[in-house]
Amino acid sequence: MSRSETITALKQYFKVKELVCPHTYQRYGENAWQFLSTCYLETLLIIREQIIAAPMYCNTSNLNQRGLRCNLCPIVSNKQSLYLSAHILGKAGDFTVRGLTAEEARNKIIQNAHLLPYPIRMEKNVTWLHIDTLPQHNIVEKVYLF
């Protein structure tokens, strides 16, 4: 599937406004898809359609730094030292899944890791589902919990 086809398929489930910070959306609108990694988008589509198969929410009216973060986002701009994350690289999102706890969603993904097109990282012991496709040096697991 091409990048364009992946984005078209994802639009059934997500608006780009949900996947990027408000600053990015205000500046770039629908063109903000350009800042999201193709590997991340392909992985998100598989997780949403084939693994979770339920509504997933990233940015909402109350939570707006859960997807792509730019240099103006408080989580980034308040840092006093070097800050690099999959979120600022367009390779991560923090999600709430309708009908599942974060732990249940993580377990579903782990059980279906063979469906994932790329290795992923998931944050453990948090109340949200963090998914990213940031490559890890010397990590061979398809799903790496950190």
Question: Which role does the model predict for each range below?
Answer:
Residues L19, I52, N71, H114-L116:
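Compositionally biased, intrinsically disordered/low-complexity regions enriched for serine, proline
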Residues M1-Y57:
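Active-site acidic/histidine clusters and adjacent loop/turn architecture
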Residues F35-S37, R69-V76, K108-N112:
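A short linear-motif detector with a strong N-terminal bias
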Residues Y83-F146:
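Catalytic cores and adjacent binding grooves of peptidoglycan-active enzymes
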Residues L41-Q80:
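Extended, low-complexity, intrinsically disordered C-terminal regulatory tails
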